[in-house]
From Swiss-Prot:
GO terms for cellular component: cytoplasm; endoplasmic reticulum membrane. Belongs to the sterol desaturase family. It comes from Homo sapiens (Human). The chain crosses the membrane at residues 29-49, 77-97, 134-154, 168-188, 215-235, 237-257. Promotes megakaryocyte differentiation by enhancing ERK phosphorylation and up-regulating RUNX1 expression. Residues 176-299 form the Fatty acid hydroxylase domain. GO terms for biological process: positive regulation of megakaryocyte differentiation; positive regulation of protein phosphorylation; sterol biosynthetic process. It is a multi-pass membrane protein. Induction: Up-regulated during 12-O-tetradecanoyl phorbol-acetate (TPA)-induced megakaryocytic differentiation of K562 cells. Down-regulated in primary acute myeloid leukemia (AML) patients. This is Fatty acid hydroxylase domain-containing protein 2. The keyword Secreted does not apply. PANTHER family: STEROL DESATURASE (PTHR11863). It is found in: Cytoplasm; Membrane.
Amino acid sequence: MKGEAGHMLHNEKSKQEGHIWGSMRRTAFILGSGLLSFVAFWNSVTWHLQRFWGASGYFWQAQWERLLTTFEGKEWILFFIGAIQVPCLFFWSFNGLLLVVDTTGKPNFISRYRIQVGKNEPVDPVKLRQSIRTVLFNQCMISFPMVVFLYPFLKWWRDPCRRELPTFHWFLLELAIFTLIEEVLFYYSHRLLHHPTFYKKIHKKHHEWTAPIGVISLYAHPIEHAVSNMLPVIVGPLVMGSHLSSITMWFSLALIITTISHCGYHLPFLPSPEFHDYHHLKFNQCYGVLGVLDHLHGTDTMFKQTKAYERHVLLLGFTPLSESIPDSPKRME
C-alpha cells in the first residue's frame, strides 16, 4: 500500500511539475510573441513619426534659431517663456474648458462621464474661488521661483538654450526617464505626506476635495507643492541636462496629465483618472502616478477589488464605463 501511495504521489507530483513547465512555456511563448509584436509595432510607429519629425525638423530648427537670434544675450527670458508661460497657458486653457463644465453642468452629455455621480453638480463656487486663489499663489510664489532657480543649474550642466534641437528618439528616451523619476519621487513623497505628522498640517488641504476637479491638481499647501508637485517633475530635466524644447513639452504634458487625473470625468480617448480619483475617495490607496510602485508595495489591493479598477482603462468608445461596467447592486438588508 505504501508503495502504491508513494507511486501515486510521485505521479501526481510529476503531473504538477508538467503543468507548471507547460504553463511556463505557454507564458514564455505568449510574452515572447507579445514582446516581438510590440517591438515591431513600436518600430513601425517610431519610423513614421521619425520621418515626420525629420521632414519638419528643418522647419522647427529654423524657427528655434530665429528665436535664439531674437533673444540673443537674453536667453533666460526665452527659458522663462518656454518653461513657465507656455505650460501655464496649456494648464489654464484646459482647465478653463473643464471649469465651464464644472460650474454650468453644460454640455449636459459630459455629466454621463462623471466618476463620482452626484458630486460637484455644480461645484461649490466659494470653495472653487478659494482653490483657484491657492493655485495661483502656488504658481506665482512657488513654481515660478523654482523654475527660475533651475535655469542657472541647467546652464552650468548643459545649456538648455543650445542651438541644436534634440532628435525624436532622444526626446522619447528623455520622456521615459522623466516619467520613471516622477513616479519614484512622487510616490514616496506622497506617502510621506500621508504620515500623521505631515498629513494634518500639510497634505490635508489637498484632500479637502474628496471628489476632485481639474484645477485642484495644484491646490495644495506650499510645502507640498514644492516637494511633491514640483520636484518630481523638475529633477528629470535637471539630471538629463535637457533642451528647453524637451522641458517645455514635459512640463506641459505633466500639467495636462495631472489635470486629467483630477478632473473627475472618465472621458473618451483620454488617460483614465480612475486611479487617482479613488485615492481622493479612500485616501490610503493609489499613491503613485503609473501605479507601478503601488503594485510593488501593495497599496492598490483595495482598488483592485473595485469596479473602479475594472474601469481603469482607456475609453475608446462613447459609452461611459459607468454604464458598460455598472456598480454592483447594493444588498437589501
